[in-house]
Curated annotation (Swiss-Prot):
Coiled coil segments of this chain: none
Pathway: Sesquiterpene biosynthesis
Domain (FAD-binding PCMH-type) ranges: 63-235
PANTHER family xrefs: BINDING OXIDOREDUCTASE, PUTATIVE (AFU_ORTHOLOGUE AFUA_1G17690)-RELATED (PTHR42973), FAD-BINDING PCMH-TYPE DOMAIN-CONTAINING PROTEIN-RELATED (PTHR42973:SF53)
Species whose genome carries this gene: Penicillium rubens (strain ATCC 28089 / DSM 1075 / NRRL 1951 / Wisconsin 54-1255)
Gene Ontology MF annotations: FAD binding; oxidoreductase activity
Keyword terms of this UniProt record: FAD, Flavoprotein, Glycoprotein, Oxidoreductase, Signal
Expression induction or repression: Expression and the subsequent production of PR-toxin take place under static culture conditions (oxygen limited), whereas no expression of the PR-toxin genes occurs under the strongly aerated conditions required for optimal penicillin production. There is a negative control of the transcription of the PR-toxin genes by the penicillin biosynthesis gene product(s), or by a regulatory peptide encoded by a small ORF inside the penicillin gene cluster.
Residue intervals passing through the bilayer: none
Signal peptide: 1-22
Similarity remark: Belongs to the oxygen-dependent FAD-linked oxidoreductase family.
Positions glycosylated per UniProt: N41, N197, N281, N307, N329, N361, N477
Protein name listed in UniProt: FAD-dependent monooxygenase prx3
Keyword ATP-binding in record: no
């Protein structure tokens, strides 16, 4: 039995803890009110049509949440001011640019503040030379290409116009121009960043160079980037388009990619790009193929892609003379921006080789056959997409100054990243589908290890929810994480971006 003194001490401790909790809840309840008072034109409350547009219709229905309010700052200074209010209130929040990350919590939040950067939408050249374009963090790539196409210029930006600028670049960034320019992030010459203490700073090769390095793939762990300054380059002509294939063309498509994805193949041409997908509709059993092709220049029949263009297709729209804007408009999947589906990405990697290409395809169909339970799901489609990080891309990333991702070339053919993706209709199927994709990744990794082709890397922008914790352990062959943590501690000693923004990819969640 407790003594009277012990009882009184326990009672006091309980009431004190209750008081602390009540104080925190009170501060958080007032955060939206304070945002509204300070920034009435930038704060959106539940019930408004704008709130519904920003919140109720995410790209993936797996990310459907209800924040307490939405804060849409119109400048870096408003970001800093809003962040100060959230920090003082100890208020959890999420930051969304365009929200094409189908990981719950990465760009959405319940019972917290959702900061959206869509009002940071300027696109302008840094000076009359037009060698650098300054891009507000709230833009989609389509917005950027509309400006650049007028001058026959391009940047190492996203392949799909509906994708947001910020998320793609903070995760590295795959583009049509990777072989010449490395990751999209390797073309960033300056970041405008709001730090946890409210400072608006520049991060580039001369100023805050450690932060500059860390932001090239280190995700949302250091501050809120409000502007990206990217180097431009001339692309007056492009050949390319997209093609759709029926089941009879799938073996030739995989064979063509097996020839392409080696150093002696078409991928040795830095002007070429190809990333074919195999699609399987679980409901109908239909198998089909889709691919985007691009070749920089005005060659109407690029030799690097001949193995693909010789394959009979059900539809293709290849032509020459396109700007980056025209090419993107023609190849953007029709339903890419539709937000009425549940989406999942999952990713792994292999040392590129013809054997690796065949192994990925065989594993895809073997795991489908071994999991008949997926046929009970509602309207599920699954895809296998090949994405090659060529030797040229790896060299370009290194010569640009490097990045935390730190790819190396194990066999001289580059790194083959695999994206196994899915979309479906009903939340009741989530658990079944998540397990199915985890089984597929595990099976491919095991098979790759047995034949010496496993490459320990997950492309952050294509990761599954189950892959968020050890992403950074895989960077730079396991050596980047301590440095990233040190930089984060330097710029955010109170761990605002580790604890108040709980979703997504966090160093605090990564094993040592």
């Amino acid at each position: 039995m407790l003594s009277l003194g012990a009882f009184l001490a326990l009672s006091l401790s309980f009431h004190l803890s209750q008081g602390v909790v009540a104080s925190v809840l009170h501060r958080r309840a007032n955060a939206c009110k304070k945002l509204s008072r300070s920034y009435p034109n930038s704060t959106i409350h539940p019930g408004s049509s704008v709130f519904a547009e920003d919140v109720i219709e995410p790209w993936s229905q797996t990310c459907q949440t209800t924040p307490t309010c939405v804060f849409a700052p119109a400048s870096a200074e408003e970001v800093a001011g809003g962040l100060a209010i959230l920090r003082k209130a100890d208020q959890t929040f999420a930051v969304r640019t365009q929200g094409h990350m189908p990981i719950p919590g990465a760009a959405d939040i319940s019972n917290g503040v959702l900061m959206v950067t869509t009002s940071l939408n300027s696109v302008q050249y840094a000076d009359d030379s037009k060698s650098v374009v300054q891009i507000g963090a709230g833009n989609r790539w389509l917005d950027v290409y509309k400006v650049l196409a007028k001058d026959s210029l391009a940047v190492a930006g996203g392949r799909f116009g509906q994708v947001g600028v910020s998320g793609l670049l903070l995760g590295g960034g795959i583009s049509y121009f990777n072989s010449d320019h490395g990751w999209g992030a390797n073309s960033v010459v300056n970041y405008e960043v709001v730090l946890a203490n409210g400072t608006v700073c520049a991060a580039n090769a001369q100023q805050n160079s450690d932060l500059y390095w860390a932001l090239k793939g280190g995700a949302f762990n250091f501050g809120i980037v409000t502007r990206f300054d990217l180097a431009t380059f001339s692309v007056p002509y492009m050949w390319g388009g997209s093609a759709y294939y029926d089941a009879s063309a799938l073996d030739p498509l995989v064979n063509a990619y097996a020839s392409y994805a080696v150093a002696s193949g078409g991928s040795s041409d830095p002007a070429a790009h190809s990333d074919p997908s195999i699609l399987y509709n679980v409901t109908t059993g239909e198998v089909s193929g889709y691919s985007i092709y691009m070749h920089r220049g005005d060659d109407p029949a690029p030799a690097a892609l001949k193995n693909f263009t010789d394959i009979p297709s059900t539809f293709q729209d290849f032509r020459v003379g396109k700007t980056i804007l025209g090419h993107e408009n023609d190849t953007n999947p029709v339903n890419f921006g539709v937000g009425n589906r549940r989406q999942l990405f999952s990713s792994t990697a292999l040392a590129s080789s013809a054997e690796a290409v065949y192994l990925v395809n065989q594993t895809f169909f073997d795991v489908i056959a071994a999991n008949p339970q997926i046929k009970t799901t509602t309207d599920l489609s699954v895809t296998n997409t090949y994405q090659l990080f060529t030797p040229g891309m790896i060299r370009a990333a290194e010569t640009s100054g490097g990045d935390p991702i730190g790819l190396y070339d194990p066999l001289g053919n580059g790194v083959l990243a695999v994206l196994y993706g899915g979309n479906w209709a009903d939340a009741k199927d989530d658990e079944t589908i998540y397990k199915f994709f985890q089984d597929m990744i595990d099976e491919l990794d095991n098979r790759a290890k047995k034949v010496g082709l496993y490459y320990d890397f997950v492309y952050l922008n294509d990761a599954a929810p189950t892959q968020t914790k050890d992403i950074f352990q895989k960077f730079s062959n396991g050596t980047a994480l301590p440095k990233l943590r040190e930089i984060a501690e330097s710029y955010d000693p109170d761990q605002v971006f580790q604890t108040l923004t709980p979703g997504g990819f966090k160093f605090i969640n990564s094993p040592a």
